[in-house]
Amino acid sequence: LKRKCFILVLILLGSLKGLFSQTPNTKINLELKNVTFQKAVNSFENKLGISINYATSIAPRKVSFRCYRTRGKKALILFLNEYGMTYKVVEGNTIVLKLLPKKRKQPNHKLSGKIYESASGEELIGCRIYNYANRKTSFTNEQGYFIMDLSTGNNILEYFYPGLEPVFDTLKGDRNYRINQALVLVEDSVKTVKTVQIRSNYRLSGNDLAGTVAGSHKLTSDKIKWTPQLLGETDVMRSLSSLPGVVAGSEGMLGIYVRGGNLDENLVLLDGVPIFNAYHLYGIFSSFNSDIVKNADLLKGYFPAKYGGRLSSIINIHSKDGNSYKLKGSASIGLLSSKVSLEGPLVKDKTTFYVSMRRSYLDFLTQQVANRVSVKDSLNNNLYYYFDANAKLTHRFSKRLKLGLSFYNSQDKGGYKQNTTTESIKGKIKESKEETSTWGNTLFSANLTYLHGNNTYIKLKAFQTKYNFRFDQKYAIEKDLIGTPSKIDDQVQYRLTNGVQDRELSLHLEKYLKWTTLNFGAGLINHKFTPGDRFLLSNINQSESKIEFNDNPSSTFEAYQYGEWTQNFSRRTILNIGIRNSIHFTTDKQLYAFPEPRIALKTKLGKNNWFNLSATQNYQFFHLLNNFTVGLPSDLWVPSTESIKPVKSSQLSFGFNKNLNMYSFSLEGFLKEYDNLLEYKETESYITNNTNWENIIASGKGNSHGLEFMAEKKKGRLRGWLSYTWLKSNRVFKDLNGGKAFPSRYDRRHNISITSTYAFNKKWRFSAAWAYASGFAFTLPIGKYVSPTPQDPYREIFIYEGRNNERARANHRLDISISHKRVLKRYSRTWVFGLFNAYNHHNPFFYQFLYNKDGQQELNSVSLLPIMPNLSYSIQF
């Protein structure tokens, strides 16, 4: 009996051991590739010596699995878990498969809110919020708002904005949070070692590049403040012109040119409203007072779908709303200009205002300086002044609803005078020539923004922006010749006026999801053009003649709709896909409708490296014509018509970024194709022509390609950057240059910019900026003849052979400044001394035929400004 009981116990123990008793420690190899589930089950049964039962309803159709030298039981568990199953032992070596129980989904809690600067209450645009727990990054939008996911457990958060102290916070991921986070201004001294080390550890992850796309740059007010001061003040457009891919005009030339594009291909926005001419002093200064600038964005590769109507760049400048807590102001007086600004609350925490004004007195100073500096190729009678004013009112109805009202005006006048006297045995001749240009911008805008829920921003925008231009040319000659019965006293005067005006009403929606951001919008624009009112008044041989020839004003409409999807994949790849559809109605009942697709990809390579790729297609429905031959430049804005098609641009951009603790490096390339470009026909000038502008222009194609490099030092006493651009830009017009390709005006092969600032301590700071650019191309005449018309017998008509067949000499200039700042109890004051064009290099602004001492005409380059010392004093209270 005892023996029978012992045998029974052994049998029971064997049955309990059961499963896998034949191969308890056997390692198996198995490779299943797209096989049926039953075949996979048979393979495991054969390998493990077991029987597997399951319901067909839980079995997938096809499966794949691979293991090498894996214990049999572990291999089965891995296989079943991969397809959401597990098993249960029923008896012996028999198991039954079943589905894994569904895990309870954890609630997805979010953090949202606004980030602002503590001293003023200004909402911060582009502030970065990083969550160390889930490695997610978010950036504040134009209203300073952000939203991001929280992980379960503790979330360590960092709020960072350049020039402000970073803030760290810890939140539990057990609920939703809505915050208003204040960041404190960092003093002008070098950051403490502790702060630098914290931010250094973060930057090694490379996440501070996560919000950028190919060909984009962001300038905060702190970064602009660290750039060299130009004639006593910092300048946002000057800072942008030192970036790669941006070519500044020689001594001005009315602005900056991006990736081989024309001036009108830059969409310059002030708080989202277009500015048609954003420059003072023919491009030396921007028309934006640096005191009002909060930050600025430059886009030259991928354009978000909400932007359209331009081909080369988007320059979006955000102005300050005004201090929410107390009245503050600043005033500055210098040798060249003075400015004043005032800001503060009208209703505390509800309504704020900001006003500023600036005026130069270059018209009094320049001639005095020029007369004391030897400038052989410059005119001694330059005249110039500029003025600008800003006003902004912001009212917050609640934490969700905000209204902003803005006004802006700028005015410029510049030109030159020349008087020559020639004496010979034949007699005496006196000539007087004067050219002046006057232009200005005026805008009004209203923006209403509303936060719906915690993840949807709605913006309603309305504005009117207007630009006017006037060009005057006067010529007078007195001849007192021996043998003639009477003295000759003739006069001729030309005048051209033109302008453009935009009115827009638009609605924009921005929605934030877990890994996705969606943007939608639509708008209607009314474009009004005054192509040109031309006037000729002459007094020849005591006979007065007056002629007017004008083009009729035109009004066109443009409707646009856009949508954009931004997706973040696994924290390493960001994809932007957008589409914009623009419909343009011309005055001659022609309709143009074009889709404008765009795509951008940004992916992380290693720890600190990012690769960017983007492709875009854009259309532009109006054009800016310039007479860059000889003489002062003049503007003419014209619309697309039935015979003049919109300009089309297709661009491919690619780039590589490397970001380290104190340094960053970038290398980018681009390929760009144009169609339907416009230029004046050879020998044609709209100013002195009595025909419609459409009859004197030619249409053609173009292309640009180039490489851009930038190295930047971002922290420490010494800060700055070096940029280099290699650029090639060509044009092909059937009716120009015999149909052969020719370089564009903006084909400047090599462009170098070095910008640096050194802070000796909290008080003293030294800045320097040096820029070099290859000479611009221009069309040089091979001959000339005098107008045969009796009303205008002194007008010289030039004969051209080729297009842009001559190069100006290279442009280079060094600007330096040193500043001293002292903070007192109730105010701070700053002295700035600087030198513009420190080594007095005479950069050509334009070329002009002038009479020499022998009475012969010769080609001379005209320089706008020689070496210019500057001393300014400013206070902030």
Please annotate each region the language model reported.
Residues N568-R571, L671-E673, N695-A777:
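Gram-negative outer-membrane beta-barrel transporters
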Residues L80, F139, E165, K172-N180, ...:
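Periplasmic N-terminal accessory/gating domains of Gram-negative outer-membrane beta-barrel systems
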Residues D675-N676, K763, A771-Y794, R809-D815, ...:
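C-terminal beta-signal and adjacent terminal beta-strands/loops
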Residues T394-K413, E435-Q590, K604-G606, K658, ...:
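Face-selective signature of the C-terminal outer-membrane beta-barrel domain
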Residues K413, T420, S424, N468, ...:
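Surface-exposed extracellular loop regions of Gram-negative outer-membrane beta-barrel proteins
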Residues Y83, V90-N108, S112-E122, C127-Y130, ...:
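Short, acidic, small-residue-rich periplasmic hinge/interaction motif at the N-terminus
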Residues Q493, D502-S506, F549-Y562, T641, ...:
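Outer membrane beta-barrel strand-and-loop segments of large Gram-negative receptors
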Residues N134-Y145:
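Short, acidic Ser/Thr/Gly-rich low-complexity loop/linker segments typical of extracellular
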